[in-house]
Protein backbone atom coordinates (compact mmCIF):
# COMPACT_ATOMS: atom_id res chain seq x y z
CA UNK A 1 0.00 0.00 0.00
CA UNK A 2 1.57 3.30 -1.07
CA UNK A 3 0.77 7.03 -1.37
CA UNK A 4 -1.76 8.45 1.08
CA UNK A 5 -4.97 9.84 -0.44
CA UNK A 6 -6.30 10.60 3.05
CA UNK A 7 -4.86 9.86 6.49
CA UNK A 8 -5.48 10.17 10.21
CA UNK A 9 -2.81 10.91 12.81
CA UNK A 10 -3.59 11.50 16.45
CA UNK A 11 -2.46 11.18 20.05
CA UNK A 12 -4.39 9.08 22.55
CA UNK A 13 -7.23 11.59 23.21
CA UNK A 14 -10.42 10.23 21.56
CA UNK A 15 -8.21 8.15 19.27
CA UNK A 16 -10.58 5.20 18.90
CA UNK A 17 -13.62 7.39 18.27
CA UNK A 18 -11.67 9.30 15.60
CA UNK A 19 -10.53 6.02 14.03
CA UNK A 20 -14.08 4.65 14.02
CA UNK A 21 -15.38 7.75 12.23
CA UNK A 22 -12.50 7.66 9.73
CA UNK A 23 -13.00 3.97 8.96
CA UNK A 24 -16.77 4.30 8.56
CA UNK A 25 -16.51 7.43 6.40
CA UNK A 26 -13.91 6.04 3.96
CA UNK A 27 -15.17 2.42 3.74
CA UNK A 28 -11.95 1.67 1.88
CA UNK A 29 -8.64 -0.08 2.46
CA UNK A 30 -6.87 1.53 5.43
CA UNK A 31 -3.36 0.65 6.59
CA UNK A 32 -1.62 1.81 9.74
CA UNK A 33 -0.81 1.21 13.35
CA UNK A 34 -1.93 1.54 16.97
CA UNK A 35 0.70 2.33 19.60
CA UNK A 36 0.69 0.62 23.00
CA UNK A 37 0.14 3.98 24.70
CA UNK A 38 -3.39 4.24 23.30
CA UNK A 39 -4.12 2.43 26.57
CA UNK A 40 -4.45 5.97 27.94
CA UNK A 41 -7.53 6.53 25.76
CA UNK A 42 -9.13 3.36 27.11
CA UNK A 43 -8.29 3.55 30.83
CA UNK A 44 -7.23 6.21 33.33
CA UNK A 45 -3.52 5.61 32.68
CA UNK A 46 -0.52 7.68 31.63
CA UNK A 47 2.84 7.37 29.87
CA UNK A 48 5.70 9.42 31.32
CA UNK A 49 8.77 7.35 30.46
CA UNK A 50 11.53 8.46 28.07
CA UNK A 51 10.62 8.44 24.36
CA UNK A 52 13.54 8.55 21.92
CA UNK A 53 11.43 7.76 18.84
CA UNK A 54 8.49 10.23 18.90
CA UNK A 55 6.16 8.27 16.62
CA UNK A 56 2.51 9.46 16.47
CA UNK A 57 0.29 7.36 18.77
CA UNK A 58 -2.01 6.34 15.90
CA UNK A 59 -1.60 6.61 12.15
CA UNK A 60 -3.73 5.18 9.32
CA UNK A 61 -3.89 6.06 5.64
CA UNK A 62 -6.14 5.38 2.68
CA UNK A 63 -3.73 4.36 -0.10
CA UNK A 64 -3.88 5.62 -3.66
CA UNK A 65 -2.27 2.39 -4.85
CA UNK A 66 -2.52 -1.16 -3.58
CA UNK A 67 -0.33 -4.10 -4.66
CA UNK A 68 -1.87 -7.44 -3.63
CA UNK A 69 0.23 -10.60 -3.89
CA UNK A 70 -2.05 -13.60 -4.35
CA UNK A 71 0.02 -16.76 -4.72
CA UNK A 72 2.27 -16.11 -7.72
CA UNK A 73 0.04 -13.34 -9.11
CA UNK A 74 0.17 -9.59 -8.49
CA UNK A 75 -3.09 -7.63 -8.42
CA UNK A 76 -2.83 -3.84 -8.59
CA UNK A 77 -5.65 -1.56 -7.43
CA UNK A 78 -5.68 2.20 -7.95
CA UNK A 79 -8.01 4.59 -6.18
CA UNK A 80 -8.29 6.60 -9.41
CA UNK A 81 -7.17 4.44 -12.32
CA UNK A 82 -5.06 6.13 -14.98
CA UNK A 83 -3.36 4.03 -17.71
CA UNK A 84 -0.42 6.43 -18.01
CA UNK A 85 0.21 6.25 -14.26
CA UNK A 86 0.19 2.43 -14.26
CA UNK A 87 2.79 2.42 -17.03
CA UNK A 88 4.91 5.05 -15.27
CA UNK A 89 4.79 3.10 -11.99
CA UNK A 90 5.99 -0.11 -13.68
CA UNK A 91 8.86 1.76 -15.30
CA UNK A 92 9.80 3.25 -11.93
CA UNK A 93 9.74 -0.20 -10.30
CA UNK A 94 11.90 -1.73 -13.05
CA UNK A 95 14.40 1.13 -12.90
CA UNK A 96 14.47 1.31 -9.11
CA UNK A 97 17.99 1.71 -7.79
CA UNK A 98 19.18 0.26 -4.51
CA UNK A 99 19.54 2.83 -1.74
CA UNK A 100 23.13 3.94 -1.33
CA UNK A 101 22.65 4.58 2.38
CA UNK A 102 24.78 2.17 4.37
CA UNK A 103 24.18 0.97 7.91
CA UNK A 104 26.86 2.19 10.32
CA UNK A 105 29.52 -0.49 10.59
CA UNK A 106 30.28 0.60 14.16
CA UNK A 107 26.70 0.96 15.39
CA UNK A 108 26.87 1.06 19.19
CA UNK A 109 23.87 -0.78 20.67
CA UNK A 110 23.23 0.10 24.30
CA UNK A 111 20.97 -1.51 26.88
CA UNK A 112 18.66 0.97 28.62
CA UNK A 113 18.52 -1.05 31.85
CA UNK A 114 21.62 -2.74 33.28
CA UNK A 115 21.45 -6.42 34.15
CA UNK A 116 21.62 -5.62 37.87
CA UNK A 117 18.82 -3.07 37.57
CA UNK A 118 16.74 -5.49 35.46
CA UNK A 119 17.02 -8.26 38.06
CA UNK A 120 16.00 -5.81 40.80
CA UNK A 121 12.95 -4.65 38.83
CA UNK A 122 11.83 -8.23 38.14
CA UNK A 123 12.14 -9.00 41.87
CA UNK A 124 9.88 -6.02 42.62
CA UNK A 125 7.28 -7.28 40.14
CA UNK A 126 7.41 -10.74 41.74
CA UNK A 127 6.76 -9.06 45.11
CA UNK A 128 3.65 -7.40 43.61
CA UNK A 129 2.50 -10.82 42.40
CA UNK A 130 3.03 -12.46 45.79
CA UNK A 131 1.12 -9.62 47.45
CA UNK A 132 -1.83 -10.37 45.16
CA UNK A 133 -1.68 -7.10 43.16
CA UNK A 134 -1.38 -8.98 39.84
CA UNK A 135 -0.94 -12.54 38.53
CA UNK A 136 1.43 -11.79 35.66
CA UNK A 137 3.19 -8.83 34.03
CA UNK A 138 4.94 -8.56 30.67
CA UNK A 139 8.08 -6.60 31.56
CA UNK A 140 10.17 -5.13 28.74
CA UNK A 141 13.47 -3.36 28.25
CA UNK A 142 14.91 -1.29 25.41
CA UNK A 143 18.09 -1.62 23.37
CA UNK A 144 19.02 1.52 21.41
CA UNK A 145 21.62 3.31 19.31
CA UNK A 146 22.06 7.09 19.07
CA UNK A 147 23.55 9.08 16.18
CA UNK A 148 22.77 6.03 14.07
CA UNK A 149 22.33 5.62 10.33
CA UNK A 150 20.81 2.43 8.93
CA UNK A 151 19.51 1.25 5.57
CA UNK A 152 15.93 0.29 6.53
CA UNK A 153 15.20 -1.95 3.53
CA UNK A 154 18.49 -3.81 3.91
CA UNK A 155 17.96 -4.31 7.66
CA UNK A 156 14.34 -5.45 7.15
CA UNK A 157 15.42 -7.97 4.50
CA UNK A 158 18.18 -9.40 6.71
CA UNK A 159 15.91 -9.58 9.76
CA UNK A 160 13.28 -11.54 7.89
CA UNK A 161 15.83 -13.88 6.33
CA UNK A 162 16.94 -14.77 9.86
CA UNK A 163 13.42 -15.18 11.27
CA UNK A 164 10.94 -15.80 8.38
CA UNK A 165 7.92 -14.82 10.50
CA UNK A 166 4.30 -14.96 9.31
CA UNK A 167 3.36 -11.34 10.13
CA UNK A 168 6.37 -9.31 8.98
CA UNK A 169 5.87 -5.63 8.16
CA UNK A 170 7.92 -2.87 6.56
CA UNK A 171 6.23 0.44 7.40
CA UNK A 172 7.47 3.92 6.45
CA UNK A 173 5.78 7.17 7.41
CA UNK A 174 8.03 10.05 6.37
CA UNK A 175 11.14 9.68 8.59
CA UNK A 176 9.64 6.97 10.84
CA UNK A 177 10.35 3.31 10.03
CA UNK A 178 9.10 0.02 11.47
CA UNK A 179 11.06 -3.11 10.47
CA UNK A 180 9.10 -5.97 11.98
CA UNK A 181 9.71 -9.72 12.06
CA UNK A 182 6.84 -10.55 14.37
CA UNK A 183 5.44 -14.08 14.70
CA UNK A 184 2.30 -12.98 16.56
CA UNK A 185 -1.20 -12.15 15.36
CA UNK A 186 -3.19 -9.80 17.58
CA UNK A 187 -6.61 -9.76 15.95
CA UNK A 188 -8.27 -10.91 12.75
CA UNK A 189 -11.89 -10.45 11.69
CA UNK A 190 -13.45 -12.26 8.73
CA UNK A 191 -17.19 -11.72 8.45
CA UNK A 192 -18.47 -12.11 12.01
CA UNK A 193 -15.59 -14.41 13.07
CA UNK A 194 -12.98 -12.78 15.34
CA UNK A 195 -9.65 -14.55 15.98
CA UNK A 196 -6.85 -13.76 18.44
CA UNK A 197 -3.64 -15.80 18.76
CA UNK A 198 -1.69 -14.82 21.89
CA UNK A 199 1.91 -16.00 22.26
CA UNK A 200 3.25 -16.80 25.70
CA UNK A 201 6.10 -19.29 26.08
CA UNK A 202 9.50 -19.29 24.36
CA UNK A 203 12.28 -21.87 23.98
CA UNK A 204 15.61 -21.81 22.17
CA UNK A 205 16.20 -23.61 18.84
CA UNK A 206 19.19 -25.95 18.42
CA UNK A 207 21.06 -27.11 15.31
CA UNK A 208 21.11 -30.69 16.58
CA UNK A 209 17.67 -32.23 15.76
CA UNK A 210 17.50 -34.30 18.96
CA UNK A 211 18.44 -31.33 21.14
CA UNK A 212 15.93 -29.16 19.28
CA UNK A 213 13.11 -31.68 19.74
CA UNK A 214 13.99 -31.92 23.43
CA UNK A 215 13.74 -28.12 23.77
CA UNK A 216 10.35 -28.17 22.02
CA UNK A 217 9.02 -30.95 24.28
CA UNK A 218 10.28 -29.20 27.41
CA UNK A 219 8.43 -26.04 26.35
CA UNK A 220 5.20 -27.97 25.78
CA UNK A 221 5.38 -29.52 29.26
CA UNK A 222 6.85 -26.59 31.22
CA UNK A 223 4.35 -25.70 33.98
CA UNK A 224 5.50 -22.06 34.18
CA UNK A 225 5.19 -21.49 30.42
CA UNK A 226 1.79 -23.19 30.30
CA UNK A 227 0.61 -21.15 33.28
CA UNK A 228 1.67 -17.90 31.54
CA UNK A 229 -0.13 -18.88 28.36
CA UNK A 230 -3.32 -20.05 30.06
CA UNK A 231 -3.60 -16.85 32.14
CA UNK A 232 -3.32 -14.67 29.03
CA UNK A 233 -5.66 -16.93 27.03
CA UNK A 234 -8.25 -16.48 29.77
CA UNK A 235 -7.75 -12.71 29.63
CA UNK A 236 -8.25 -12.74 25.83
CA UNK A 237 -11.43 -14.84 26.26
CA UNK A 238 -12.75 -12.25 28.68
CA UNK A 239 -11.84 -9.33 26.39
CA UNK A 240 -13.48 -10.92 23.33
CA UNK A 241 -16.65 -11.73 25.29
CA UNK A 242 -17.37 -8.00 25.63
CA UNK A 243 -18.29 -7.71 21.93
CA UNK A 244 -19.20 -11.34 21.20
CA UNK A 245 -22.52 -13.06 20.60
CA UNK A 246 -23.50 -14.83 23.80
CA UNK A 247 -21.79 -18.21 24.20
CA UNK A 248 -19.68 -17.83 21.05
CA UNK A 249 -16.21 -17.44 22.62
CA UNK A 250 -14.10 -20.59 22.16
CA UNK A 251 -10.51 -21.64 22.75
CA UNK A 252 -9.76 -23.46 19.49
CA UNK A 253 -6.21 -24.40 20.51
CA UNK A 254 -4.55 -24.18 23.92
CA UNK A 255 -0.76 -24.06 24.31
CA UNK A 256 0.10 -25.23 20.79
CA UNK A 257 3.83 -25.37 19.99
CA UNK A 258 5.05 -23.68 16.79
CA UNK A 259 8.65 -23.56 15.55
CA UNK A 260 10.27 -20.52 13.95
CA UNK A 261 13.87 -20.20 12.78
CA UNK A 262 15.10 -18.60 16.01
CA UNK A 263 12.75 -19.97 18.69
CA UNK A 264 9.90 -22.34 19.54
CA UNK A 265 6.73 -20.53 20.68
CA UNK A 266 3.63 -21.53 22.63
CA UNK A 267 0.52 -20.13 20.92
CA UNK A 268 -3.18 -20.37 21.78
CA UNK A 269 -6.10 -19.51 19.48
CA UNK A 270 -9.28 -17.86 20.77
CA UNK A 271 -12.31 -17.12 18.57
CA UNK A 272 -15.67 -15.41 18.91
CA UNK A 273 -18.61 -14.33 16.77
CA UNK A 274 -19.09 -10.57 16.68
CA UNK A 275 -22.35 -9.20 18.07
CA UNK A 276 -23.83 -7.04 15.24
CA UNK A 277 -24.37 -4.09 17.62
CA UNK A 278 -20.59 -3.55 17.85
CA UNK A 279 -18.22 -2.12 15.25
CA UNK A 280 -14.83 -3.63 14.49
CA UNK A 281 -13.12 -0.60 16.07
CA UNK A 282 -15.02 -1.37 19.29
CA UNK A 283 -13.61 -4.92 19.17
CA UNK A 284 -10.12 -3.43 18.94
CA UNK A 285 -10.76 -0.94 21.75
CA UNK A 286 -12.06 -3.61 24.14
CA UNK A 287 -9.12 -5.96 23.51
CA UNK A 288 -6.26 -3.42 23.30
CA UNK A 289 -3.48 -3.51 24.29
CA UNK A 290 -3.31 -7.26 23.71
CA UNK A 291 -3.05 -9.32 26.90
CA UNK A 292 0.17 -11.01 25.83
CA UNK A 293 1.95 -7.63 26.14
CA UNK A 294 0.38 -6.48 29.42
CA UNK A 295 -0.31 -9.22 31.94
CA UNK A 296 -3.27 -9.87 34.20
CA UNK A 297 -5.34 -8.24 35.53
CA UNK A 298 -4.66 -5.93 32.63
CA UNK A 299 -5.09 -2.46 34.19
CA UNK A 300 -3.10 -3.25 37.34
CA UNK A 301 -0.36 -4.88 35.26
CA UNK A 302 -0.10 -1.82 33.00
CA UNK A 303 0.29 0.46 36.02
CA UNK A 304 3.14 -1.65 37.41
CA UNK A 305 4.74 -1.89 33.95
CA UNK A 306 4.75 1.91 33.71
CA UNK A 307 6.42 2.18 37.13
CA UNK A 308 9.18 -0.34 36.40
CA UNK A 309 10.00 0.20 32.73
CA UNK A 310 12.23 3.11 31.73
CA UNK A 311 11.16 3.62 28.12
CA UNK A 312 7.82 4.60 26.65
CA UNK A 313 6.75 1.60 24.58
CA UNK A 314 5.13 3.55 21.75
CA UNK A 315 4.67 1.37 18.69
CA UNK A 316 6.52 -1.53 20.32
CA UNK A 317 3.85 -3.93 21.66
CA UNK A 318 1.25 -2.05 19.67
CA UNK A 319 -0.22 -3.38 16.41
CA UNK A 320 0.12 -2.87 12.66
CA UNK A 321 -2.51 -3.95 10.19
CA UNK A 322 -5.34 -3.04 7.87
CA UNK A 323 -9.07 -2.51 7.48
CA UNK A 324 -10.57 -3.97 4.30
CA UNK A 325 -13.46 -2.18 2.53
CA UNK A 326 -15.91 -4.83 3.85
CA UNK A 327 -14.86 -4.20 7.47
CA UNK A 328 -12.56 -7.21 7.86
CA UNK A 329 -9.27 -6.57 9.65
CA UNK A 330 -5.95 -8.24 10.38
CA UNK A 331 -3.40 -6.91 12.88
CA UNK A 332 -0.12 -8.23 14.20
CA UNK A 333 1.64 -7.61 17.52
CA UNK A 334 4.71 -5.40 17.20
CA UNK A 335 7.43 -7.56 18.75
CA UNK A 336 10.81 -8.71 17.34
CA UNK A 337 10.86 -5.32 15.61
CA UNK A 338 13.33 -2.49 14.98
CA UNK A 339 12.08 1.10 15.10
CA UNK A 340 14.00 3.94 13.46
CA UNK A 341 13.58 7.71 13.57
CA UNK A 342 15.76 8.78 10.65
CA UNK A 343 15.54 12.48 11.50
CA UNK A 344 16.71 11.92 15.09
CA UNK A 345 19.18 9.19 14.02
CA UNK A 346 17.74 6.96 16.75
CA UNK A 347 17.35 3.17 16.48
CA UNK A 348 15.42 1.17 19.05
CA UNK A 349 14.20 -2.35 19.72
CA UNK A 350 12.68 -3.79 22.86
CA UNK A 351 12.18 -7.27 24.25
CA UNK A 352 10.30 -8.65 27.21
CA UNK A 353 9.06 -11.68 29.07
CA UNK A 354 6.14 -12.66 31.26
CA UNK A 355 6.86 -12.40 34.97
CA UNK A 356 4.89 -14.76 37.23
CA UNK A 357 5.25 -16.02 40.80
CA UNK A 358 7.41 -18.86 39.42
CA UNK A 359 9.83 -16.54 37.60
CA UNK A 360 13.57 -16.69 38.21
CA UNK A 361 14.93 -13.18 37.40
CA UNK A 362 18.16 -14.51 35.86
CA UNK A 363 16.21 -16.81 33.50
CA UNK A 364 13.87 -13.97 32.47
CA UNK A 365 16.94 -11.90 31.62
CA UNK A 366 18.34 -14.74 29.48
CA UNK A 367 14.99 -15.04 27.67
CA UNK A 368 15.16 -11.34 26.80
CA UNK A 369 18.67 -11.75 25.38
CA UNK A 370 17.47 -14.72 23.29
CA UNK A 371 14.64 -12.64 21.83
CA UNK A 372 17.05 -9.77 21.11
CA UNK A 373 19.54 -12.00 19.29
CA UNK A 374 18.25 -11.63 15.71
CA UNK A 375 17.89 -7.85 15.96
CA UNK A 376 21.37 -7.43 17.40
CA UNK A 377 22.79 -9.62 14.64
CA UNK A 378 21.35 -7.58 11.77
CA UNK A 379 22.40 -4.27 13.32
CA UNK A 380 25.96 -5.28 14.23
Where are the model-predicted features located?
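Extended alpha-helical targeting/anchoring segments
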Residues: 1-380
